[in-house]
């Protein structure tokens, strides 16, 4: 995350920031740490789940094949970090399952549970 922050800072432009993806970072690190370090550089936020256990068992790409709350994100810590940096932008769901009314409801219900945590 330190290198990512420096990379953005090297542009010396308020128009350049980070499109932060919680699930992608969890595959290799701790999203809450990245959020604190990137801080105000975060301009957009992808809300995505990831399972390290599944990735270790069946390959890295399979870690993304889990529903919200079935992976390894520490959602209370992630939400606290987001709050700590004063982020007030959009949170974009980047999860499969919104291809039917029932799937969309499931996705929405799970996101509600995340944001209530």
What are these regions (language model features)?
Residues 1-16, 23-117:
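Histidine-acidic metal/acid-base catalytic patches
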């Amino acid at each position: 995350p330190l290198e990512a922050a420096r990379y953005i800072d090297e542009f010396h432009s308020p128009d350049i920031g980070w499109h932060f993806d919680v699930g992608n970072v969890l595959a290799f690190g701790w999203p809450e740490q990245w959020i604190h370090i990137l801080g105000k550089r975060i301009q957009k936020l992808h809300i995505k789940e990831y399972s390290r256990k599944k990735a270790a068992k069946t390959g890295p790409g399979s870690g993304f094949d889990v529903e919200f709350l079935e992976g390894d994100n520490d959602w209370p810590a992630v939400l606290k970090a987001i709050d700590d940096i004063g982020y007030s932008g959009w949170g974009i769901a980047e999860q499969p399952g919104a291809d039917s009314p029932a799937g969309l409801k499931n996705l929405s219900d799970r996101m509600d549970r995340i944001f209530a945590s």
